[in-house]
């Protein structure tokens, strides 16, 4: 249905939804409700409820719909109302949006209820707005906000919208209605060209009256000089400076260039913003690498010495085992056997064999094992006890 023309018209509701997305007339209905609330020049909850009933906003969720479309419509309705609750809208529009969120949340037909999606980056602004309500003693609006928090109506998320793979790279920015927008330059709104012209006329008339009243027409009496003569010029200069500052703030590219000396002096101290991140990362990396403790040379030598000692101990164990086996072999042969001349001539060969035993594992044949076994049995056989008759 179209935009409500009168107070008794029914707003565009769930019956017009054909797919996912904002219904075509829902935003128009919201702006109509908020504009009428703005015209009342009030922030009272009772005034908003009167408009809510007259526009029949309670029937916004009525209509035959399946549960899936009902949930999607409720999410979109709450998300659209949430936009008017954030800056740069005026204080009165934000209060009206708070009442609108309260009405939509409590009249929805979803079970369980759909929550209001709130990005974490916006929550600080919301808390600041709640503090402003308390300071201004708008307790009805503060009570509505507290009731929503107690009902756990807010769903805190990282992003304002649910991200997916099909999201566009460039997110479309919503346009703010000019009549709902909070003026960012209140000075220029207060002091216009007409106001300056009127102030100039009053100041000239004041100076003329001082000359007319004083005895000396050329020099007015000092007792009559209650306002400085350059009062208007000072105000005019301040307004012009504010205009230039506001333009530079909006468009930094319009900022006048400095002189060569100043530019060179400040250019070395100020780095471009795009390089700040790279510089900070480089500092972090340098600090991380400098924290690594290098291994001292003494440890390396100590470690190599330990390795060499291990190898020496290993070779010493091999030598000890070979010596033990050599001792066990000596009694294996007959005690009265004499060495032949051939064995005497082969003495250097035996020494070489002993050296090779120190370096490699000894090889024991089966005959030697039998001989060693017999020797061990002979050594460790216990003497038999004689039986007593």
Swiss-Prot record:
GO terms for molecular function: DNA binding. It comes from Mus musculus. One of its GO terms (cellular component) is nucleolus. This is snRNA-activating protein complex subunit 1. It holds the Pfam family SNAPC1. Residues 245-262 have a biased composition (Basic and acidic residues). Keywords: DNA-binding, Nucleus, Phosphoprotein, Transcription, Transcription regulation. Residues 1-15 have a biased composition (Low complexity). Residues 183-287 are annotated as: SNAPC4-binding. The gene is Snapc1.
């Amino acid at each position: 249905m179209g935009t409500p023309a009168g107070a008794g018209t029914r707003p565009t509701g769930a019956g017009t939804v054909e797919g996912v997305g904002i219904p075509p007339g829902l935003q128009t209905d919201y702006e109509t409700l908020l504009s009428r609330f703005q015209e009342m020049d009030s922030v009272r909850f009772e005034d908003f409820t009167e408009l809510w009933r007259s526009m029949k906003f309670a029937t916004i969720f009525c209509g035959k719909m399946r549960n899936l479309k009902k949930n999607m419509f409720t999410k979109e309705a709450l998300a659209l109302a949430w936009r008017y609750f954030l800056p740069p809208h005026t204080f009165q529009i934000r209060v009206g949006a708070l009442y609108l969120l309260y009405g939509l949340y409590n009249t929805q037909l979803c079970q369980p209820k759909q929550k209001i999606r709130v990005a974490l980056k916006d929550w600080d602004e919301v808390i600041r707005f709640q503090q402003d309500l308390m300071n201004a003693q708008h307790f009805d609006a503060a009570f509505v906000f507290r009731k929503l928090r107690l009902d756990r109506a807010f769903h805190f998320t990282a992003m304002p919208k649910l991200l997916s793979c099909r999201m566009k790279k460039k997110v479309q920015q919503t346009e703010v209605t000019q009549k709902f927008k909070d003026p960012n330059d209140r000075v220029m709104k207060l002091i216009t060209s007409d106001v300056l012209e009127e102030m100039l006329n009053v100041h000239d008339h004041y100076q003329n009256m001082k000359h007319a009243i004083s005895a000396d027409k050329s020099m007015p009496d000092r007792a009559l000089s209650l306002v400085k003569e350059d009062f208007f010029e000072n105000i005019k200069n301040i307004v012009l400076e504010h205009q230039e500052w506001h333009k530079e703030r909006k468009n930094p590219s319009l900022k006048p260039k400095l002189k060569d000396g100043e530019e060179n002096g400040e250019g070395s101290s100020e780095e471009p913003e795009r390089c700040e991140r790279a510089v900070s990362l480089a500092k972090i990396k340098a600090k991380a690498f400098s924290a690594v403790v290098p291994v001292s040379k003494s440890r390396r030598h100590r470690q190599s010495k330990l390795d060499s000692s291990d190898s020496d101990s290993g070779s010493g164990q091999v030598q000890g085992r070979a010596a033990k086996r050599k001792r066990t072999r000596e009694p294996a042969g007959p005690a009265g056997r004499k060495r032949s001349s051939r064995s005497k001539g082969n003495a250097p060969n035996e020494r070489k064999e002993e050296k090779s035993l120190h370096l490699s594992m000894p090889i024991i044949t089966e005959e030697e094992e039998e001989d060693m076994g017999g020797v061990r049995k002979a050594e460790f056989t216990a003497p038999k006890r004689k039986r007593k008759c």
